[in-house]
């Protein structure tokens, strides 16, 4: 089922931290720039960089409930009309500091 119109996702991707795309909409490719650092490249440019990026990762350690993933922007200028660059961070609550990690599942949605 597809939803088009105001407030619909303009792009989304279900990928691995290493750049393999499982499924996507309006995403040409995912590029691994380094550990926990990926670029999401859009098929069709978005009109400007005034969009919203949301993200989710799986649990990096599998069943260990004290280890979670954080999706954040790579920099203050990581959103462009042709794509965005994100960082995935493993945040384990009994270890510091958080570390960039390639998660098994990374989901990113873009809304405009």
How should each PLM-predicted stretch be described?
Residues 1-48, 92-112:
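Extracellular receptor-binding modules and their adjoining Ser/Thr/Gly/Asp/Asn-rich linkers
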Residues 61-112:
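Extracellular jelly-roll beta-sandwich "head" domains, especially the C-terminal globular C1q domain
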């Amino acid at each position: 089922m597809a939803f088009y119109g105001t407030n619909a996702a303009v792009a989304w991707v279900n990928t691995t931290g290493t750049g393999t795309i499982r499924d996507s909409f309006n995403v040409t490719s995912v590029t691994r720039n380094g550990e926990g650092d990926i670029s999401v490249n859009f098929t069709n440019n978005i009109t400007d960089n005034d969009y919203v990026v949301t993200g989710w990762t799986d649990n990096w350690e599998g069943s260990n409930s004290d280890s979670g993933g954080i999706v954040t922007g790579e920099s203050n200028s990581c959103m462009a009309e042709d794509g965005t660059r994100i960082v995935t961070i493993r945040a384990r609550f009994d270890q510091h500091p958080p570390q960039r990690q390639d998660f098994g599942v990374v989901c990113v949605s873009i809304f405009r």
